[in-house]
Design a protein with these regions (language model features):
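Low-complexity, Pro/Ser/Thr-rich intrinsically disordered segments
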Residues: 23-46
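Gly/Ser-rich "nucleophile elbow"/oxyanion-hole loop immediately N-terminal to the catalytic nucleophile
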Residues: 45-67, 77-83, 133-141, 258-262, ...
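Primarily recognizes the serine-hydrolase "nucleophile elbow" in alpha/beta-hydrolase
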Residues: 56-103, 223
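The feature captures the conserved acid-bearing segment of alpha/beta-hydrolase catalytic domains
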Residues: 94-171, 214, 255, 259-261
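Cap/lid segment of the alpha/beta-hydrolase catalytic domain
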Residues: 99-108, 192, 196-197, 276-285, ...
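N-terminal cap/lid segment of alpha/beta-hydrolase-fold proteins
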Residues: 110-127, 221-262
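Active-site-adjacent alpha-helix of alpha/beta-hydrolase-fold enzymes
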Residues: 150-175, 180-182, 197-202, 281-304, ...
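Short beta-strand element of the alpha/beta-hydrolase
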Residues: 263-275
Length: 347
């Protein structure tokens, strides 16, 4: 617990303190957005635009780790009529932080504020349903793969389990893994970092292929993984037309060869966590996530949006799951969420 509190104090508490001790997190953060708060942007590059492909909208899913897990959940709930499911590592329930950085720290990562008030989150979600987001009735029959390691010192297992509780309330079919002795990280067979390791790049090997497991849950039976030279291409593209508060000027998309040639293809959006964007670990997440090898042989396009840090509200380049970019961060009109959705629609 001490390790959990220490790490999340580093990640989120500076954001809360920067806007005052009153706890009025959203108001301060939103004000900064509208008054031109400075951001650290990647150097502009001459890159291709994101291309359009022949997307099979019946097979669109999202995945993420930590803050990326929470953004994935926000996308699923906000666009439940289109997104069929999600895979999450170390995530929390939809709208868990409730526009408050301190709740994010002490309720949705640690447990100092007590258990997650799932019934309150469900009440708020019901009030937003069909107005600020797709109707929650669309969630019935969707799929969620939820992973939380027994050694995770950043996001408590009880938080991940509360996400399962909320998903089940809305009729989402959840498959869970709460028994692996894993620290806080994205589980992939493509790294040698031990399962119990905490720290950058937050990619860990736990002796099984998590991507095979959740991609099968999302899309059905898979062709064999390509363990050789990939026929598809990893493309760095200009994200600037889609970039909102704390989004980088470039991002990545992996496109299998047959998808580039016009075949109808599936899509999964893979969202990195804090300190995992390219400004921290380069292309490690986009090349070692374990997704591209399965995507190459299964007609799956993989979109890797990129977030960046700023010195005031988001020093570790997290996706917005507590309101630093505006109080509507978790619904369809959210600054980052709407831009990621625009990229998905472009594909």
């Amino acid at each position: 617990m001490k390790q959990l509190t220490r790490l999340w104090t580093l990640l989120i508490l500076p954001c809360a303190l920067a806007i005052g001790a009153s706890g009025a997190a959203v108001q301060g953060m939103t004000s900064a957005v509208h008054h031109g708060a400075s951001q650290t942007r990647a150097r502009p590059q001459t890159l291709p635009t994101l291309a359009a492909y022949n997307l099979d909208w019946s097979n669109v899913a999202v995945a993420g780790i930590s803050s990326g897990s929470d953004m994935a959940t926000q996308l699923l709930y906000a666009h439940s009529s289109k997104i069929k499911g999600e895979a999450t590592f170390a995530g929390s329930p939809f709208f868990c932080a409730q526009d408050d950085a301190l709740d994010a720290l002490y309720l949705c990562a640690g447990t100092e504020y007590g258990p997650v008030p799932v019934s309150t989150l469900e009440y708020d979600t019901d009030n937003a349903s069909c107005i600020y987001m797709d109707c929650v009735s669309n969630l019935k029959g969707r799929y969620a793969w939820i992973f939380s390691g027994t050694l995770d010192s950043v996001v408590a297992q009880s938080v991940a389990k509360s996400a399962q509780t909320m998903d089940t309330f809305y009729g989402i079919s959840a498959t869970t893994n709460y028994t692996t002795a894993a620290e806080h990280g994205w589980v992939t067979p493509d790294v040698t970092t031990s399962c119990s390791t905490l720290g950058e790049p937050f990619l860990i090997n736990c002796g099984f292929d998590a991507e095979q497991t959740f991609l099968t849950g999302l899309f059905g039976t898979l062709n064999a993984r390509n363990n050789g030279t990939l026929s598809g291409k990893l493309i760095q593209f200009n994200q600037s037309p889609y970039a909102a508060f704390d989004m980088d000027s470039s991002a990545y998309v992996f496109v299998p060869a047959n998808c580039a040639s016009g075949s109808k293809c599936k899509l999964i959006v893979a969202l990195h966590g804090c300190e995992m964007g390219q400004s921290f670990i380069g292309t490690q997440f986009v090349t070692e996530s374990g997704l591209n090898e399965w995507a190459d042989t299964n007609s799956i396009i993989v979109l890797y949006p990129q977030a960046i840090p700023d010195s005031t509200y988001n020093p570790y380049g997290c996706w917005d799951w507590w309101g630093y970019a505006g109080s509507n961060y978790s619904v369809s009109g959210g600054a980052q969420l709407s831009k990621i959705w625009a990229m998905m629609q472009r594909i």
